């Protein structure tokens, strides 16, 4: 075994009471998170976004390869280009690609091909999966469980942004290949999703939908 090991940093053994309190507090906070489609143009400090990305970067990953990249776009001309290309793909989706069943499932969310939030929100974060790494000499390094790892990191990023007081929306135009050119990402990376981040517009509304209960999403096996 050649691994270099160190003591677990900040190891704590909390009481059951403290752990229960913390877990309940986190649940109360995170259950207030909602996907928002009406974003304010109010500016958000870039340092807040950077801190949340740093939190995402602490996610576990296969063989610690950390196969993610977060490309940040503030408000500017690039955002208009992203919106135009994304809406083109969305129109194709709604008009020709989506099945009737899929469109029916989307009705409760009130979505359509118009994506104004791609311009109005202060930040877009293009999240990319590194299919493989590239060493300084140009050779390739295999990445393990890259998609799963980036999915976990994205979840942490969404939770961190919510904790900071910001709203988010996950957007996945299909196909997303145009994002590589816009965000200037290399061929070993492919788009995972676009994360919209900012303050919700005053008076913003969200669909009247519910999350599943504990009994519906979990089970006990003896």
Task: State each model region's role.
Residues 55-57, 108-113, 179-181, 204:
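Glycine-rich, charged/polar anion/phosphate-binding loops
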Residues 72-150:
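Glycine/small-residue-rich phosphate/adenosyl-binding loop
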Residues 64-67, 119-121, 190:
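Short, basic and Ser/Thr-rich N-terminal targeting/leader segments
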Residues 1-36, 40-48, 84, 92:
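N-terminal accessory segments that position/regulate proteins before the catalytic core
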Residues 91-98, 184-207:
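A glycine-rich helix N-cap at a beta->alpha junction
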Residues 33, 52-56, 125, 131-182:
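Small-aliphatic-rich amphipathic alpha-helix that forms the alpha element of a beta-alpha
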Residues 2-18, 22, 112, 193-222:
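C-terminal helix-cap and adjacent tail motif
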Residues 57-64:
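Glycine-rich phosphate/pyrophosphate-binding beta-alpha loops
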């Amino acid at each position: 075994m050649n691994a270099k090991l160190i003591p677990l940093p900040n190891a704590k053994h909390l009481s059951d009471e403290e752990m229960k309190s913390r877990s309940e507090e986190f649940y109360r906070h995170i259950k207030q998170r909602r996907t928002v489609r009406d974003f304010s143009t109010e500016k958000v400090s870039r340092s807040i976004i950077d801190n949340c990305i740093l939190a995402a970067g602490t996610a576990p990953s296969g063989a610690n390869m950390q196969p993610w990249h977060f490309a940040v776009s503030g408000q500017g001309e690039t955002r208009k280009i992203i919106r135009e290309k994304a809406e083109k793909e969305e129109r194709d989706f709604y008009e020709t690609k989506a099945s009737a069943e899929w469109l029916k499932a989307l009705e409760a969310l009130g979505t359509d091909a118009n994506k104004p939030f791609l311009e109005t929100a202060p930040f877009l974060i293009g999240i990319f999966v590194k299919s493989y790494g590239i060493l300084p000499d140009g050779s390739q390094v295999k990445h393990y469980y890259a998609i799963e790892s980036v999915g976990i990191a994205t979840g942490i990023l969404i939770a961190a942004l919510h904790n900071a007081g910001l709203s988010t929306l996950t957007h996945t135009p299909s196909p997303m290949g145009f994002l590589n050119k816009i965000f200037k990402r290399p061929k070993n990376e492919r788009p995972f999703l676009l994360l919209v981040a900012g303050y919700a517009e005053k008076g913003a509304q969200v669909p009247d939908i519910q999350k599943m209960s504990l009994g519906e999403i979990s089970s006990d096996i003896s």
